[in-house]
A protein has these predicted regions:
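Carbohydrate-associated surface elements
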Residues: 170, 192, 253
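Short hydrophobic beta-strand element within catalytic cores of glycosyltransferases
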Residues: 323-324, 328-331
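A short, well-ordered alpha-helix in the C-terminal region of glycosyltransferases
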Residues: 363, 370-384
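Nucleotide-activated donor-binding/catalytic signature segment of Leloir-type glycosyltransferases, i.e.
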Residues: 260-288, 292
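A short helix/loop element that forms part of the nucleotide-sugar donor recognition site in Leloir-type
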Residues: 197-210, 215, 269
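Conserved acidic donor-binding segment of nucleotide-sugar-dependent glycosyltransferases
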Residues: 343, 347-354, 363-368
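Conserved donor-binding/catalytic core segment of Leloir-type glycosyltransferases
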Residues: 210-226, 232-235, 247-250
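Acidic donor-binding loop of glycosyltransferase active sites
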Residues: 162, 280-287, 296-313, 327
Length: 428
């Protein structure tokens, strides 16, 4: 297997397990539902999965909330941080120091933990520096060419974390080569996905009004970075060859985009659909989908697409879900897709290219053997990424960080020494 920075967390049977001899008190720092953002959904799913394991862990929530907002209010939140308020971060750090918390788990995205005024001002590193309990920080975005202020922020956050987690090997390499993060601190734990059994697909097709349709789908918060207009263009040609083809664009407009611009982008998609006469071939489902609804829509999907426009996107939760569902995927070649869809686990296309999207989608529809190979390879690659497995990996890492702090020894963490090539993207 290729030598990669960081130690690799694999399936539970690949772990050196440490005894969990007492209950851990863990503080989860993140946005949380009902706030509509990917990090909130991820944190909620991870915490629910940890609670369903046998790990002796008690979770407390530290919610990142909009300043002076009541929209994010939850009764089960013990601490609240006002997003953009550096003093609020430090106040909560001091409160955590007075608590019985053993370890802090942080879900990081730049917009949640800092502010911009021409350069990035990070609020997380001072928070971590003020903490007495050790912290594990998960980076959901790792940019290959960061602004100097962002590079410095990630370096400092990692320096004040006992361990850092990323979800792809590309991100692990960037942390080491670009940000100067000690590889011994870096763990690769895949994005979790629900356990999916698609034995009721026919019933679901009837419920959704999709019987007899070839379903192409994409889900997630809608915004211009998703490149959805190129899929609308694609459907003009796909529908001409396959009149039963239907594109489902599933998800609400990103709330921050809606606050700035209203529904301008969604309206532009609707106008294009009407102009091209595609009302019977493109359906926009303007809802924030629950986990079960996502699973149900994936069950009826024949081709999943992520026509995203940002080549530097290091992680896509929707792509992880589609692979976890064993779906044939077409995607632009952003960083996560390039790693995840290698070795015939999906088809990659160029950016902003309706012709390439059209060709790839038609290949999957018209070549049953190709579709079957893509589905089988996707399922095989994702078999260890179900939330129960990911939760056990995270729980073991949290325990190891606490054990290391208690031992006050310098030896590196040993959370996992082996990862299957299909899971990691490495080659054996």
């Amino acid at each position: 297997m290729n030598q990669l920075p960081g130690r690799l967390c694999g399936p539970s049977e690949g772990l050196i397990k440490m005894p969990m001899h007492r209950r851990l008190k863990v503080a989860m720092v993140s946005t949380l539902p009902p706030r509509q953002c990917g990090i909130a959904t991820f944190a909620a799913n991870l915490c629910a999965a940890i609670r369903r394991t046998d790990a002796p862990i008690d979770l407390e929530f530290v919610a990142i909330e909009h300043l002076n907002s009541v929209d994010d209010a939850r009764s089960d939140v013990r601490w609240r941080i006002s997003q953009g308020d550096r003093a609020s971060f430090l106040d909560v750090a001091r409160s955590l120091n007075r608590s019985n918390i053993n370890v802090v788990c942080v879900e990081h995205e730049f917009g949640l933990y800092g502010t911009w005024d021409g350069e990035y001002h990070d609020h997380l590193a001072p928070f971590l520096a003020a903490l007495r309990p050790p912290a594990v920080t998960t980076f959901h975005t790792v940019l290959p060419v960061p602004a100097p202020s962002m590079l410095a922020a990630i370096h400092e956050i990692a320096a004040h974390s006992a361990a850092v987690v990323v979800m792809t090997h590309g991100a692990a390499r960037l942390l080491s080569s670009v940000y100067g993060v000690n590889p011994e601190k870096v763990r690769v734990i895949p994005h979790g996905v629900p356990v999916m059994a698609h034995d009721n697909a026919s019933e679901l097709r009837d419920r959704f009004g999709l019987a007899g349709r070839t379903v192409i789908s994409t889900f997630g918060l809608v915004d211009p970075r998703k490149g959805l207009e190129f899929m609308v263009d694609t459907m003009e040609f796909v529908a001409a060859r396959h009149p039963d083809a239907l594109l489902l664009i599933l998800g609400r407009t990103h709330p921050e985009l809606r606050a700035r611009e209203g529904e301008r982008y969604r309206s532009s998609l609707v106008a294009a659909i009407q102009r091209k006469g595609l009302a019977g071939h493109v359906r926009l489902v303007d809802e924030y989908l629950s986990e079960q609804e996502i699973v149900d829509y994936l069950a009826v999907t024949d081709v999943y697409v992520t026509p995203y426009l940002d080549p530097d996107q290091i992680m896509s939760g929707t792509l992880a879900y589609a692979l976890g569902a064993g779906k044939a995927v077409v995607s632009t070649a952003y960083l996560h897709a390039t790693e995840a869809l290698a070795e015939e686990r999906g088809l990659l296309v160029g950016f902003r290219s309706a012709p390439e999207l059209t060709s790839a989608v038609l290949r999957i529809i018209e070549e049953p053997g190709l579709r079957q190979r893509l589905e089988a390879n996707a399922h095989q690659a994702s078999r260890h990424t179900a939330w129960p497995n990911v939760a056990r990996l995270v729980a073991a890492l949290l325990q190891e960080v606490v054990d290391q702090r208690q031992r006050s020894a310098a030896r590196p963490l040993v959370t996992g020494l082996w990862t299957p090539a299909l899971l990691t993207g490495g080659r054996s």
